[in-house]
């Protein structure tokens, strides 16, 4: 039987090592993680898809400008939650888009799109 102080120490060490791995904080499964590289080709492609798909669905004419911030969530594929700057006529506004992406199936779906 392990003495109680040693058991407590082992528990604390285990909890600490589980909280930080490789200098990175762990995110709960299914949690949203900030996107580190907003200018990556993948993120830009998803953002442009979101604006284009919104324009088709809403018969709108927004023009993509940039990604302001974004998060990903691992599901059966990846959810992207992006704040996108887009031009509506002469006015640039921010819009939040959620896109579900499964690249191995060539599947991409605009889940939501709204002005923020």
UniProtKB/Swiss-Prot annotation:
Q: Name one Pfam family in it.
A: SQAPI
Tell me, what is an example of a GO biological process annotation in this record? defense response
Record localization: Secreted
> Cellular component GO terms, alphabetically?
extracellular region
Extract the InterPro entries matched here. Answer: Cystatin_dom, Cystatin_sf
Predominantly, its location class is secreted
Taking every annotated instance into account, which residue ranges of this chain make up the domain Cystatin? 30-89
Q: Does the keyword Ribonucleoprotein apply?
A: no
Recorded GO molecular functions are:
cysteine-type endopeptidase inhibitor activity
Where in this protein would one find the motif Secondary area of contact, according to its record?
73-77
Q: How is it modified after translation?
A: Glycosylated.
Signal peptide as annotated in the record = 1-26
Report residues carrying sugar chains: 109
Family statement: Belongs to the cystatin family. Phytocystatin subfamily.
Q: What does this protein do?
A: Specific inhibitor of papain family cysteine proteinases. Inhibits papain, chymopapain, bromelain, ficin, human cathepsins B, H and L, actinidain and house dustmite endopeptidase 1, but does not inhibit human bleomycin hydrolase. Inhibits papain with an IC(50) of 2.47 nM. Does not inhibit cysteine proteinases belonging to other families including clostripain, streptopain and calpain.
Looking up PANTHER family in the UniProt record yields:
CYSTEINE PROTEINASE INHIBITOR 5 (PTHR47364:SF2)
Specify the protein name.
Cysteine proteinase inhibitor 1
């Amino acid at each position: 039987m392990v003495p109680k102080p040693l058991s407590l120490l082992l528990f604390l060490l285990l909890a600490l090592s589980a909280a930080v791995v490789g200098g990175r904080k762990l995110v709960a499964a299914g949690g949203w993680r900030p996107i580190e590289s907003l200018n990556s080709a993948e993120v830009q492609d998803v953002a442009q898809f979101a604006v284009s798909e919104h324009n088709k669905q809403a018969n709108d004419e927004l023009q993509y400008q940039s990604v302001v911030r974004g998060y990903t969530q691992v599901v059966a594929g990846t959810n992207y939650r992006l704040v996108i700057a887009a031009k509506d006529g002469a006015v640039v506004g921010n819009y939040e888009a959620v896109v579900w992406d499964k690249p191995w199936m060539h599947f991409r779906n605009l889940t939501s799109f709204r002005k923020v």
